[in-house]
Design a protein with these regions (language model features):
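N-terminal hydrophobic or amphipathic helices/low-complexity stretches enriched
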Residues: 4-75, 218-219
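Second-shell loop/turn segments in exported
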Residues: 25-31, 46-56, 83-87, 173-175, ...
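Noncatalytic luminal/extracellular "stalk/propeptide" segments of secretory-pathway proteins
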Residues: 49-144
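Active-site metal-coordination/substrate-binding segment of hydrolases
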Residues: 108-141, 146-150, 225-258, 262-268
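Soluble metallo-hydrolase cores and metallopeptidase-like ectodomains found primarily
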Residues: 164-246, 268-269, 273
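Short helix-loop-beta-strand segments that form the rim/entrance of peptidase-like active sites
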Residues: 264-289
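Metal-dependent peptidase/peptidase-like ectodomains
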Residues: 281-379
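His/Asp/Glu-rich mid-to-C-terminal helical/loop segments that flank catalytic regions of hydrolases
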Residues: 379-419
Length: 419
């Protein structure tokens, strides 16, 4: 009799648990790559004008992400959804770009976008007047000018393509950097030889701005376990002097949208064993400023954490690339080993690279086990053609399947997935 009671009790509990799991599973949000694509399209639309750090559009993007975190019921990390920091940003002025070559008898203007175009590297000085009386070094692919106004670098654009725009590097020794076509290069050389004066004005300046990272957390059940960090940067390059927008769909509306969809999914699961921190990082294009601040400001809370950063997700027929910092190459990385094994077991093509090319580097430099997951297709990166048209939902799903297995293994048990 006791055996029958035990048997039926066990059977009842098993069936009850099964029904509970099924009921709870109905409330689990399933990751949807098409929603990621829709959000990429939205964040990389002309309304956001390239999301340049320090711009109104960058602020708008941060507010949208913050409200999304709130809507998903993520808790504020350290009692706040925002982490403020101050850094130097490229700021657009209201003036008109020009490049004038003249002497007492004649003048001409170089054509913006055909002969020359500013690179976004630095704007310590945005106006230069120079001639062959100044210190000028001429090379086959560059011209360096130095006078009382500062230092100016011209460089010859590859294949005369002026569409590429570099990340901002205000620590660079050159105060202004301008890309030239071969025609623009030759016109400058000819003008200097003829003793003419050259005057260029670029409508950007350096300015200190208050920026924010956006942060949220799903609290874990075991505070002794180091949290898992999931990150992506939401800033991009803005627009150039004639308002051509650098949309930044792959770089990195894709990683931001992937992070938001992942947060949507994980927020509907049960309580994880370890806490999961979501951070939408700012100012990656200014030299990893947002991630550097977050890593240093929160070091003692995350020093034993693993960090997965998403940067450029969604390229068709492109292997997943796991990127770690140059100085981290000789370190043992649990997160790299684990993700690599998942790819091997699931026959997913992947590569491993060591570059300080994204926000993982800020964590690696502090000895924190971090990597970036990336589809490393650079054919449209930092050009106005980086649009949603080149985003592939199947590639997004492939990344999700790999990441999902890692997160479930690291943060959840079979039971806590549902409870």
């Amino acid at each position: 009799m006791k055996k029958k009671i035990f048997y039926f009790s066990t059977l009842f509990i098993t069936i009850l648990c099964l029904f509970i799991c099924i009921a709870l599973n109905d409330h689990i949000y399933n990751f949807n790559a098409e929603n990621v694509v829709k959000n990429i399209k939205y964040l990389s639309s002309s309304s956001f004008e390239g999301r340049r750090s320090g711009s109104e559009e960058n602020i708008l993007t941060s507010e949208i992400i913050k409200n999304k975190f709130k809507g998903l019921k993520l808790s504020p990390y350290k009692n706040s959804y925002t982490e403020e920091f101050i850094t130097t940003c490229p700021v657009k002025t209201d003036e008109t770009v020009y490049f004038k070559i003249f002497n007492d008898n004649e003048s001409e203007y170089l054509k913006y976008g055909e002969d020359y175009k500013e690179d976004m590297i630095n704007f310590k000085s945005n106006s230069f007047t120079f001639s062959n009386k100044d210190k000028i070094n001429i090379f086959s692919t560059s011209i360096a000018v130095s006078n009382d106004e500062g230092t100016l670098l011209f460089y010859l654009a590859q294949n005369d393509d002026l569409s590429f725009r570099s990340s901002f590097m205000c620590e660079l020794r050159f105060d202004l950097v301008i890309a030239l076509s071969s025609n623009g290069y030759n016109k400058i050389i000819d003008a200097l030889k003829a003793g003419k004066t050259l005057n260029v004005y670029i409508p950007f300046k350096n300015e200190a701005k208050k920026l924010v990272n956006i942060q949220g957390i799903i609290e874990g059940s075991d505070p002794s376990l180091a949290p898992l960090l999931l990150t992506a940067h939401f800033d991009h390059l803005g627009s150039d002097s004639q308002n051509n927008i650098y949309y930044g769909a792959l770089d990195n509306a894709s990683g931001t949208s992937f992070l938001l969809e992942l947060a949507n999914t994980l927020s509907t699961l049960g309580k994880p064993k370890r806490s999961i921190i979501f951070v939408a990082l700012n100012a990656e294009e200014l030299g990893l400023k947002g991630s550097s601040f977050f890593a240093e400001n929160n070091y003692f809370d995350i020093k034993n954490s693993k960090v997965i950063n998403f940067d450029m997700i969604g390229v068709e027929n492109c292997p997943i690339t796991f990127i770690q910092g140059v100085g981290f190459k000789d370190n043992s990385s649990n997160i790299l080993n684990s993700l690599s094994n998942i790819c091997l077991n699931d026959s997913v093509d992947y590569l491993v690279e060591y570059e300080n090319s994204s926000d993982h580097a800020s964590f690696n430099e502090l000895g924190i086990d971090a990597l970036t997951i990336c589809h490393s297709d650079k054919s449209h990166i930092h050009t106005p053609t980086d649009t949603v048209d080149y985003i592939d939902s199947n590639a997004i799903n492939t990344v999700y399947k790999v990441v999902n297995k890692e997160i479930k293994k690291d943060c959840y048990s079979t039971v806590t997935t549902f409870i």
